[in-house]
């Protein structure tokens, strides 16, 4: 068996075309969806992510504002800037690019963003609503993963899902979203005694650990759907995921590539949340 590639670029393109139409409809009603992004310091990966967000948002017709600030910025100055955006009706989404300098509390920043403008889906109120299965802003990468799984046409209900990784940004929330879809979810992490024992039972395997080629074919059930969230750069400069793609694609039924799998969906779902927030202002 050679796996069918789940094309994140194509799925993201379709979704972005739909969002562009929705943005145009909102503009005709006098509302231009606005996204404010705050970037502190000069982390190369963060700069690259922010450029991608700007390009995507503007291509969909959204208003995009970037505040690129020096790493010496104090926590209080950042919180005051967030307050300004919270109070500004032109902006429907506020995103503070992580990671932050060590002297700034990530928790304080996330909790300062208004839950109504928390398009990253990280605010405790929105996390709580997600746990309860209520309508809210879902974290972008997990929501993108669910979209990709839905594209396969596979019914998630009753499926054995194994999530390798338990970060607050991907691992924990993606498991919860799949639980909300009536899947049976197991989490594996650095303290899990025998990861293979769990991964070999997975109908759907989601890997988000940030370790190049961590999962090999002998840890994957025949015919499983494999979602690879990792993006790792080898010494050769090549980008690879957390799953050994060349091996795994001979065992899985569906697999996401790296790059071009989950990544394009993350920015797309950020735009989706921003448009959703803008629509709420008309309700």
From Swiss-Prot:
Pfam families: THF_DHG_CYH (PF00763), THF_DHG_CYH_C (PF02882). CDD domains: NAD_bind_m-THF_DH_Cyclohyd (cd01080). One of its GO terms (cellular component) is cytosol. SUPFAM superfamilies: Aminoacid dehydrogenase-like, N-terminal domain, NAD(P)-binding Rossmann-fold domains. One of its GO terms (molecular function) is methenyltetrahydrofolate cyclohydrolase activity. It catalyses: (6R)-5,10-methylene-5,6,7,8-tetrahydrofolate + NADP(+) = (6R)-5,10-methenyltetrahydrofolate + NADPH; (6R)-5,10-methenyltetrahydrofolate + H2O = (6R)-10-formyltetrahydrofolate + H(+). Keywords: Amino-acid biosynthesis, Histidine biosynthesis, Hydrolase, Methionine biosynthesis, Multifunctional enzyme, NADP, One-carbon metabolism, Oxidoreductase, Purine biosynthesis. NADP(+) binds at residues 165-167, 190, 231. One of its GO terms (biological process) is tetrahydrofolate interconversion. Pathway: One-carbon metabolism; tetrahydrofolate interconversion. Its EC number is 1.5.1.5, 3.5.4.9. InterPro entries: Aminoacid_DH-like_N_sf (IPR046346), NAD(P)-bd_dom_sf (IPR036291), THF_DH/CycHdrlase (IPR000672), THF_DH/CycHdrlase_cat_dom (IPR020630), THF_DH/CycHdrlase_CS (IPR020867), THF_DH/CycHdrlase_NAD-bd_dom (IPR020631). The keyword Nucleotidyltransferase does not apply. Belongs to the tetrahydrofolate dehydrogenase/cyclohydrolase family. Catalyzes the oxidation of 5,10-methylenetetrahydrofolate to 5,10-methenyltetrahydrofolate and then the hydrolysis of 5,10-methenyltetrahydrofolate to 10-formyltetrahydrofolate. Homodimer. This is Bifunctional protein FolD.
